[in-house]
Amino acid sequence: MKNLVRLLTKKKLKLSVAESCTGGMLASSITSISGASKVFNLGLVTYSNQAKIRILKVNKNIIKRYGAVSHQCCLAMVNNLSKISKAHINVSITGIAGPKGGTKQKPVGLVYIGIKKGKKVQINKCLFKSKKRSSIQKATVKKTLDLIIRISK
């Protein structure tokens, strides 16, 4: 965590996040580090579909057609967050942390992580094997931090 804050500070980059299944854990992890105010711009928890639609302006047809846990929804979340926040790096997370809510097509542990830096956008599909909610959330935060560091270098 300290490495991320140090790297973003050195590069003079601002970060914003929109979280769903992690419920603010990513923002909390980053802002727990002294100096985070230099790099952390905005943190949103858009847990419900309505929050994604109202706050992040995700088109309701995307959620209806593909679901909130999808590549398409994650992409809309990160693109629209970047319009709101004007940060250099924007991150979106949507997934199924469990222990319930999974299906054969979308099992518990399925998470999409979107990262946008400038015009470059990447959507990462992850499947965390744990059935424990907290383990999936922690693994998602760790993976997201690694991705942010990688794109920031």
Where are the predicted features?
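Short alpha-helical segments enriched in small residues
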Residues: 1-153
